[in-house]
Amino acid sequence: MWLGRWFNRRLGTSLCQTPQLADDVSAKGMIPPRLSVPVRVRCVAVSAVLLLSPLGIAQPQTSAVPAERLAAREWFRQAGFGMFIHWGVYSQLGDGEWVMQNRKIPATTYEWLASEFNPVKFDAHEWVSLAKAAGARYITITSRHHDGFSMFATRATTYNIVDWTPFKRDPLKELADECQRQGIKLFFYYSQLDWHHPDYFPRGGTGRASGRPENGDWTRYIAFMNQQLTELLTHYGPIGGIWFDGMWDKPDADWHLADTYSLIHRLQPAALIVPNHHRAPLPGEDVQTFEQDLPGANTAGFNTSTIGALPLDTSLTMNNSWGFNITDTAWKSTREIVGYLVRAAGSNANLLLNIGPRPDGTIQPEAAQHLREVGKWLQTYGTSIYNTHGGPISPRSWGVTTQRGDTVFVHLLDWRDRLLAIPLVGVRVTRASMLGDGTAVDFEQTPVGLRLTLPSVGAGEPDRVIVLRTVKGPQ
């Protein structure tokens, strides 16, 4: 993951900036970056040619996309919420997933650390059940992070959790089987960057203290990755897709993306490719993801401000670390997390919320508690998140709108007044009520919008939702 800030900046509320709101300074999106992290080499412009609209939004690719992928993209677009998991050898040191880079640990020393990894309390049923209780529709887990250690059974290298550790089990296989049983889709995070493999050469902007010889075969490294991807796509049943990360480490390298993307779609036609390269979408990709940011906001400083036509995804840490960090107690509140989830939905994006399990395989109580509280909120308000898209009113400082069919959901995240005026025009509102208890909301339509009179100013809820039933036609 991108680890590009050395300071901790926290906001109580995340506000969204979209192309439609370029003139609304109060509505600019921000998701806090994380602590104590190295600066990544920025990517150069990609080689693909994108046609941009005046608003800076990439137009859909004209090449035909198979029906299976179109259906998978639509499923993803409607999913709303997923659970991200960063877990690996680095968890043992309790200092985040970049500890090998940050502490300049040589590869041989890190190999010894890997040989001690034994997460005996890992329970796939417990993890998937927690995701389900949280209301997550999918899980994305690190199959291999930048440290180069494979968290699955692979014949491409012995440097994996089955062959190298006393654990001798394949947690990804157990997780895949449990996801199938509980009806949750599984995505595999896969790092293109590798601080361990000798053929990751020439070296990129990171991993230079690993002690590897200054030689290697890049073509052989690409073949190694494709062999592992083939294993992930053939040994674990149907998967949701591959979530790539790390290409930014060598922006000028030939990553042979066309070959790799073709391989993935050939092995599993419905598998989605989700690249975390922080650029406008490239041919063959299926989802555009934004790290620690809402789409188009780029408050983190490394995401693109171009919003493409693909389904959107925004990933977020629950504190300031992706991997387990024993000293990171800067947990976001459930209110903040719900706010990010709602603002993502109002920006046509899913929220992928991260947890970093402990080295023994257990999940920190704080993370589990927040997930269950989000799940409880979704039990009541999920209808305004799942299977919706951004509503007719662009994101504002007070909140966002989402929509399904003729129903518009007005999300009040930061509004403590009984009166609210919104610029809703072109439709006639037939009924307004509060989601949850169904209390009627008085309203008046005017030529310039809709005036709403709420039953109360609110009692500190993370999000008050007004349901508007509409029909097309004059107001």
Where are these regions (language model features)?
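Bacterial N-terminal signal peptides
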Residues: 44-54
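Mature catalytic domains of secreted/periplasmic carbohydrate-active enzymes
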Residues: 59-475
